[in-house]
């Protein structure tokens, strides 16, 4: 019989203590994304001579977190336990000496519905309607249009300012391309783009976007913009949403050079240079080592399978 896992189960509310924190450890805690938390406070204590300086923190996470994940957030040297008491009591305990390293969000009242003002504060802090929807679902449903308009006029709306990674997976039908895409990230972080359709209904800023069974069914210039690094909005029925994907997964039965006619697009290299990785399905007979079944293998173009440079 398999042994049961030991250690604390995933939990939303944790407390931690870190003795003799370095500036690097303090900065790591300061720089944690505020969207991680419903409420977070960390105080500095023991600053007087003769006492041990330490950090005393309390976190009410937006989602349940494992013991190891909490350790990763706050540092391997931290002593961590599940929190007891209310958020307000933990706030008072962590701030009792008056030296606050960081505080974000607002203490939650267990059993009481979050009010609109707290949802608005979270929206303006994070610039994310998704975060508000996750943390304040009732308030979000009742005030969606107002919150969306506030975000637009506030100038706080998140915009892409990074290069979106583009991973292309090529192989015959039934070899597992779609399953590979499903395993890439959590379902809640993944959006599957409907094919042959300009609408992005249901997209809420997910960090992974899948173009499944792709063979050129997006307009050329739209695909280039998706795979770039600049701010972009995509259309939904009745509005637009910012495109915030950090990874695009393209599965296809065809290699990229077959997606569009070279005579119909101005410069195919514009797409190829945006591709980060390219993988092809290989059967055992095609591989240099004996493998019982086929598998995906990354290639390093230019090569026989794809005679063009990528990722430059």
From Swiss-Prot:
What does the entry list as the binding residues for a divalent metal cation?
Answer: 45, 54, 97
Position of motif Nuclear localization signal?
Answer: 4-15
Catalysed reaction equations from the record: ATP + H2O = ADP + phosphate + H(+)
What domain of life is recorded for the organism? Viruses
Q: Which GO terms describe its cellular component?
A: host cell nucleus
Provide the cofactor list for this protein.
Answer: Mg(2+); Mn(2+)
What InterPro entries does UniProt report for this protein, alphabetically?
CRESS_DNA_REP, Helicase_SF3_ssDNA/RNA_vir, P-loop_NTPase
Q: Where in the cell is it found?
A: Host nucleus
Q: Which residues bind ATP?
A: 171-178
Enzyme Commission number(s): 2.7.7.-, 3.1.21.-, 3.6.1.-
- Per UniProt, the short sequence motif RCR-2 occupies residue numbers 54-56
Oligomeric and partner information: Interacts with the capsid protein; this interaction relocates Rep into the nucleus.
The record's note on its domains: There are 3 rolling circle replication (RCR) motifs. RCR-2 is probably involved in metal coordination. RCR-3 is required for phosphodiester bond cleavage for initiation of RCR.
Which family is this protein grouped under?
A: Belongs to the nanoviruses/circoviruses replication-associated protein family.
Name the chain's protein: Replication-associated protein
Q: Which organism is this protein's natural source? A: Porcine circovirus 1
């Amino acid at each position: 019989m398999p042994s049961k896992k030991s250690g604390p189960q995933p939990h939303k509310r944790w407390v931690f203590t870190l003795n003799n924190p370095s500036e690097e450890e303090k900065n790591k805690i300061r720089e944690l994304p505020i969207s991680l938390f419903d409420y977070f406070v960390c105080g500095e204590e023991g600053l007087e001579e003769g006492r041990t300086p330490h950090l005393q923190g309390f976190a009410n996470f937006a989602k349940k977190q494992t013991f190891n994940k909490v350790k990763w957030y706050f540092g391997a040297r931290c002593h961590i336990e599940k929190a007891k008491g209310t958020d307000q009591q933990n706030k008072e305990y962590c701030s009792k000496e008056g030296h606050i390293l960081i505080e974000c969000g607002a203490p939650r009242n267990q059993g009481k519905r979050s009010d609109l003002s707290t949802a608005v504060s979270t929206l303006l802090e994070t610039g994310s309607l998704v975060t508000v929807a996750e943390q304040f679902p009732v308030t979000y449903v009742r005030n969606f249009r107002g919150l969306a308009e506030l975000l637009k006029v506030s100038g706080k709306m998140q915009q892409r300012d990074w290069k979106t990674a583009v991973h292309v997976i090529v192989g015959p039908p039934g070899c597992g391309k779609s399953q590979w895409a499903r395993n890439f990230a959590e379902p809640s972080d993944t959006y599957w783009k409907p094919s042959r359709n300009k609408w992005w209904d249901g997209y809420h800023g997910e960090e992974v976007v899948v173009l499944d069974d792709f063979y050129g069914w997006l307009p050329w210039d739209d695909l280039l913009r998706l795979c770039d690094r600049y701010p972009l909005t995509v259309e939904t029925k009745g509005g637009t949403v910012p495109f915030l994907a950090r990874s695009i997964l393209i599965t296809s039965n065809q290699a990229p050079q077959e997606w569009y006619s070279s005579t119909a697009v101005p410069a195919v290299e514009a797409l190829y240079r945006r591709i980060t990785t390219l993988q092809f399905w290989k059967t055992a007979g095609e591989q240099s080592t004996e493998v019982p079944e086929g598998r995906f293998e990354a290639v390093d173009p230019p090569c026989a399978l794809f005679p063009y440079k990528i990722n430059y």
